[in-house]
Every structure is written in structure tokens, then in C-alpha cells.
């Protein structure tokens, strides 16, 4: 079934015009061929009902679950129409597994799936609908092409006096106030360098936690993004100074691992750390932690982390999430640090510092490749006990709760592979990226089987971002379809109306958002509001995934409609408007209120993503190809399009129902949508 949901209007633009056009955005879910009109006139509500629904016919590739629309076009008794959310009857896992079985539904099979338009009272469950399914001999062989890309953050500025600029300025002032020595403390402690004069870290980077480094990684990203977004020269100078200090001191730590082995005739590498017999006996206690802090010479060439490498090594022994006796999520922490260095390499205009940041990230990325390549493998067949017979089975490593949380390792390693020039390093980094695939999670999704249910939400969303990013280099459509299917399942089954997901950090069963809102606050027989819904990290990562998918589908308005929904309903409101505090979770439900906290990037995971969120609102406002500009968000901004050497200004009151686009400098010819 094809559904057009294009809210963009096309233009051919001749620069030099002072006023181009006004673009309406009202009711963007309405049919673009129809005009939105109010059904509330002179205080009399006109009762209307659904009279018809567009036909739903799905041609389903054999061996997969039909991709059912999460919204369908309905027509009302007054002649108006809009897209409405659906709920389908095939969401039980056993049903989906049957639908994906080519013996049950071979090529040529035809069947129907029933569902409802939710929020309608035609029946107890809603307005009934039916999808007709035909199984076809079509594999997922089409290779989607990258059509567009975003404009770099430093070439888009938010204008005006509004909540967007107020939040940005508040965030930048806070970022420049954070103590850079505190962010360096754990590294110096881990690499045997003096910590005199350095502030001990706190929060989830404190000496009592084994997630050290996650906050420092987010801090580096926040510095880089704030540097790109800042308009105040004195602020930029402080940011530049702190970026420079972070990069120089981290390289000093990393260079302590450059240890030559006469016996091996090469530098010690990641594969040399903790041979198998030693690994099997390795402990995760704080005593062991302190012991490994004294052995930086054994870490292996390029290792850079705020915790010693015995923690990522312990994952190869399938050690559990336990901050006292074993590990927290070591590769999650490594990812944040890689991402921070990559962001510095991307946005720092001091080439020597940008190059050094990239070098640090590359050397650490190659350490990861070395460890994964030589010390890990994938075995999928058999029981869990059989999977774990030998150390290093990635099928089990990345399927563990929390301990196996790797953040966006796949994404960062794929980005690194795009940034380095040596062919061998490119190949190794993309191989390392795919070493963070989770077969137990990916393979059902590749068939559109919903294996999202009951998983830790923010453990798995970044994995999908990594799958999509690696597709750019490995060209394996498996990864694109995993990402595409995941996104569609989120839209249809898991997101709240605000765009967020999760209940107590977990995906629950499909279509149970109302149950979560109603029951999550029940204790001792009494109902009360509970804020543990819509983790902010999840919204952060879903926006990242949506932005990347839109690069392949810039004419499909569903992606940026969702992006806009989540940015405006959760992300922007996750920063206190008067003083710097961000939300961990974003409460919804009767009498719910937002719990404020998270005053530093190391305070919690959402303190980390929160440190980045409010200096990059504009990062997905515009997408471009060679000769097309897509205006994807209606936001008061100034855009400099370097490739065309033109500057455009979008004027609107935020949030707006219309935008005016002006060309303020330069001359070029292109299409605008």
C-alpha cells in the first residue's frame, strides 16, 4: 500500500529575491490536497463520524511480517479527512512468527489482518479496518540510496528571543561553567598521572561507580556542539580553551599505552590483554579495579578510557551488571568518549586540535577492532549454556541486560571509518562497527518480527542507529531494513503522543501506553502519578535515528513530522526554563509532573544527553542534496549553504503556523521543498 504523506511544497528558487514565499504548516497530517477547516464554529460542536477508510493492500515479501500502516487516511461525514492512528490484531509474537514462516504463508498466499482506528467509538475498540495481505516473491533487495544530508550545525543559527534561544543560551552558560579538571580526573587516576589540583568527579562518574567516563564523553560532545552553536565570542573562547585542554591531556594518557614488546616484535595490542586463562579468573571487585589502574602499560596500544580494560574484557566472560562485584556497561561508556572526540574533530576549527581528537578516537577504535577481531566470535546455534562455553561470543555479550549495553559503538566506529583515509583502517573500523551487531535482536527485526517488546529501551535504540550508519559503508540492505522496520514498529506500537517511549526504562508490550500511564503509579492499592515514563535518552536517540532515516527519505514527511513532534513536545521542555536542570524521564498521565535534576553531564545518562540536547535544536532544520533544499522544521533560523554560497533566513514566530524564507546573500538556482 502506498500512502502519500508529503507536506512539502516544491519551489524553484532564484536568489536575489528579498521575499520568496510563505509556507503553511498547519495540520500537517491532513491530506495535502485538502484544506484544514475548524469543526468548531460559534461554540457549537459539529458531531462527525468516520464514513470510509482508504483501502489497505499489502504486498508482503515471503518470509516476513507485513508492514502494516500505523496511520491511515479516513474520511468523515462532513467531507473532511485526516490520518488516524491504527492498532492491529497480529501483534502477538507467536502470530508474527507464523506470518514470517514461508511454510505457513508461501508465495501466493492471501490473508487478512483486522485492526481498528483508535480513539473512535464506533465499537468498543474503535473503528474496524482490514488489511489484505498478498505474499510475493520479492526479497528486500532494493538498496536505498542516501539522497540528502543535513547542514552542519555551525552553519545554522537560531534567531530571535524565544524559548529556543533562551534554552540554548542557558545551556551554553552552564557548559562553560563546568570544571574541565573534574572531567579529566578519572583519566589521570586510571593512567597513573598526578591528580593534584583536579576535582574528583561525581554522579555516575564518581569514584564509586564503574561507568566512569560516560559523563566526560558527553561533556566533550557538549563542548563541541556548544562551540558550533555559540554566538558570543567570549563563550567560544572558553569552549575552545576547554576543548584544547581535554584533547591534549587525553592524548597524554593514551600515549602511556604505546608499549613496545621485544618478545613480540610489535607494540602490545588489545588482543594481548588478559589471555584466556587469566580472563577466566579475572575479578570485577573494586580491589581488582584498583589493581588494574596500576597496569596501564598492559592495556594495549591506543586504549583510552576512564576505567581500565579489564571491564570490557569481563563482558567476554558474560559477567553481569553489578556495580559492586562485576561491571556496569563498559562499552556504553567507551562509546560516549568516542562520540565526544568525533564531535570535537567535526566542529573544532583549530585543525591541530581537531586532528588530534580524531587521532585519539581512531587509535581507540582500532584497539576495539583488535580486541573484537582476535578475541571474539559469533555462535548462534544451541542453548545459552552452549553459547557461553568459551569466552567472547558476541551473540551473548550484546544480549545481556545493561552489562551488554554498548550505546552507539556501531555508529561511532562507522563514523570513524568515514573520517579516516587509510583503506586498511577504514576496513577495520567498519568491521569493528559490525562486531556490535546483536543477532538476537537484529534477525527478528530484519523479518519485521517485533522483538522490541520487554527490552531495555535505551540499550537497543542506539544499536539501530549503528546498524543504519554501518549500511553507508557495508552496503548490506539487511542493516537498512532492520533500522526501517524498527522505526515503523516504534511509531505504531510504542510511542506516546508526545513522541517518547518507555516505562521504567523498558519497552513493554505493544499498544500498552495507556496501561503504563494508568498503572505505573499504583502501589499499596492507591493510584498516584509516576514520572518513570519517556526516558529522555530514548527521545535523544530516536531523533538521531529519525534524522538519519530522513536522509534516505527526504520526501516522506512522516520522519520529520515525528522529529518535530518529539523535539517540541519532549526535548525542548526537558530543560527547566529558569535554571539549568534537565529531566531523566518526562512524565505523562493524570496529575503527572516533570522531575527536575541532572545539573551536570555526569549526573546520570540523561544528564549526559541533556548536556547536548539544548545546543543543537537546529541540527535537522534543513536537508540538502546537490540541487534541492528541504525545509524540514519550521524554526526561526539563518542558514548558510556553503556549496551554493548563499544565505537564507527563515522567519516565523515559534511555534509557528507559517514561515517566510528570504534569501539574504548570494545567488544560485535550486529547488526547495
Identify the function of each model-found stretch.
Residues 25-29:
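Boundary at the C-terminal end of the N-terminal hydrophobic targeting segment
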Residues 41-58, 130-150:
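Extracellular interdomain linkers/hinges and stalk-like, low-complexity segments
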Residues 70, 84, 670-672:
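Short beta-strand/loop motifs in extracellular/secreted proteins, especially
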Residues 2-12:
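Bacterial N-terminal signal peptides that target proteins for export
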Residues 39, 43-81:
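Solvent-exposed, low-complexity, repeat-rich "mucin-like" stalks and linkers
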Residues 12-22:
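Bacterial N-terminal signal peptides
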Residues 78-135:
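Serine/threonine-rich, repeat-prone extracellular segments and beta-strand-based repeat modules
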Residues 140-673:
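Glycan-recognition and catalytic cores of secretory/periplasmic carbohydrate-active enzymes
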Amino acid at each position: 500500500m502506498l500512502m502519500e504523506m508529503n507536506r512539502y511544497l516544491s519551489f524553484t528558487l532564484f536568489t536575489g529575491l528579498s521575499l520568496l514565499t510563505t509556507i503553511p504548516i498547519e495540520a500537517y497530517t491532513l491530506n495535502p490536497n485538502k484544506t484544514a477547516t475548524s469543526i468548531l464554529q460559534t461554540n457549537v460542536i459539529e458531531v462527525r463520524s468516520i464514513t470510509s477508510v482508504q483501502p489497505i493492500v499489502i504486498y508482503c515479501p515471503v518470509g516476513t511480517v507485513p508492514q502494516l500502516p500505523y496511520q491511515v487516511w479516513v474520511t468523515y461525514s462532513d467531507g473532511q479527512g485526516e490520518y488516524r492512528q491504527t492498532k492491529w490484531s497480529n501483534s502477538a509474537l507467536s502470530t508474527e512468527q507464523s506470518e514470517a514462516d514461508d511454510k505457513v504463508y508461501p508465495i501466493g498466499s492471501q490473508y487478512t489482518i483486522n485492526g481498528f482506528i483508535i480513539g473512535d467509538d464506533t465499537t468498543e475498540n474503535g473503528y474496524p479496518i482490514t488489511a489484505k495481505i498478498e505474499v510475493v516473491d520479492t526479497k528486500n533487495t532494493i538498496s536505498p540510496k542516501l539522497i540528502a544530508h543535513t547542514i552542519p550545525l555551525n552553519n545554522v543559527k537560531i534567531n530571535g528571543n524565544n524559548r529556543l534561544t533562551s534554552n540554548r543560551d542557558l545551556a551554553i552558560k552552564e557548559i562553560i561553567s563546568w570544571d574541565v579538571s573534574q572531567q579529566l580526573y578519572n583519566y589521570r587516576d586510571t593512567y597513573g598521572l598526578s591528580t593534584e589540583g583536579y576535582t574528583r568527579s561525581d554522579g555516575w562518574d564518581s569514584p564509586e561507580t564503574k561507568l566512569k567516563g560516560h559523563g566526560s564523553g558527553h561533556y566533550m560532545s557538549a563542548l563541541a556542539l556548544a562551540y558550533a552553536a555559540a554566538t558570543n565570542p567570549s563563550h567560544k573562547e572558553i569552549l575552545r580553551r576547554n576543548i584544547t585542554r581535554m584533547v591534549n591531556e587525553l592524548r597524554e594518557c593514551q600515549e602511556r599505552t604505546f608499549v613496545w614488546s621485544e618478545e613480540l616484535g610489535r607494540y602490545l595490542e588489545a588482543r594481548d590483554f588478559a589471555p584466556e586463562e587469566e580472563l577466566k579468573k579475572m575479578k570485577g571487585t573494586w580491589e581488582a579495579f584498583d589493581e588494574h589502574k596500576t597496569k596501564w602499560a598492559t592495556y594495549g596500544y591506543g586504549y583510552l578510557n576512564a576505567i581500565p580494560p579489564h571491564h570490557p574484557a569481563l563482558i567476554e566472560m558474560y559477567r553481569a551488571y553489578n556495580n559492586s562485584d562485576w561491571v556496569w556497561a563498559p562499552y556504553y561508556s567507551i562509546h560516549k568518549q568516542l562520540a565526544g572526540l568525533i564531535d570535537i574533530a567535526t566542529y573544532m576549527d583549530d585543525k591541530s586540535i581537531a586532528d588530534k581528537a580524531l587521532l585519539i578516537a581512531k587509535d581507540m577504535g582500532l584497539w576495539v577492532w583488535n580486541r573484537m577481531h582476535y578475541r571474539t566470535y559469533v555462535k548462534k546455534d544451541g542453548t545459552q549454556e552452549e553459547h557461553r562455553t568459551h569466552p567472547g561470543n558476541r551473540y551473548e555479550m550484546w544480549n545481556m541486560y545493561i552489562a551488554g549495553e554498548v550505546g552507539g559503538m556501531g555508529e561511532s566506529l562507522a563514523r570513524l571509518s568515514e573520517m579516516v583515509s587509510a583503506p586498511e583502517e577504514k576496513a577495520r573500523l567498519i568491521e569493528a562497527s559490525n562486531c556490535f551487531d546483536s543477532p538476537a535482536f537484529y534477525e527478528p527485526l530484519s523479518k519485521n518480527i517485533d522483538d522490541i517488546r520487554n527490552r531495555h529501551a535505551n540499550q537497543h535504540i542506539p544499536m539501530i542507529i549503528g546498524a543504519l550508519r554501518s549500511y553507508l559503508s557495508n552496503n548490506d540492505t539487511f542493516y537498512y531494513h532492520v533500522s526501517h522496520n524498527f522505526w515503523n514498529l516504534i511509531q505504531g506500537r510504542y510511542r506516546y503522543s508526545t513522541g517518547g517511549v518507555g516505562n521504567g526504562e523498558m519497552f513493554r508490550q505493544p499498544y500498552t501506553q495507556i496501561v503504563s500511564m494508568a498503572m505505573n503509579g499504583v502501589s499499596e492499592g492507591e493510584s498516584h502519578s509516576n514520572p518513570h515514563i519517556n526516558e529522555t535518552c530514548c527521545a535523544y536517540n530516536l531523533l538521531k535515528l529519525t534524522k538519519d532515516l530522513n536522509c534516505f527519505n527526504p520526501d516522506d514527511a512522516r520522519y520529520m513530522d515525528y522529529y518535530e513532534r518529539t523535539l517540541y513536545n519532549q526535548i525542548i521542555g526537558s530543560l527547566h526554563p529558569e535554571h539549568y536542570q534537565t529531566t531523566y524521564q518526562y512524565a505523562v498521565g493524570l496529575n503527572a509532573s516533570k522531575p527536575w535534576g541532572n545539573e551536570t553531564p555526569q549526573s546520570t545518562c540523561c544528564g549526559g544527553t541533556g548536556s547536548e540536547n539544548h545546543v543543537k535544536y537546529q541540527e535537522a532544520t534543513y536537508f540538502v542534496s546537490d540541487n534541492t533544499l528541504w525545509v524540514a522544521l519550521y524554526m526561526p533560523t539563518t542558514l548558510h549553504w556553503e556549496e551554493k554560497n548563499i544565505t537564507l533566513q527563515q522567519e516565523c514566530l515559534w511555534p509557528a503556523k507559517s514561515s517566510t524564507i528570504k534569501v539574504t546573500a548570494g545567488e544560485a538556482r535550486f529547488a526547495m521543498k
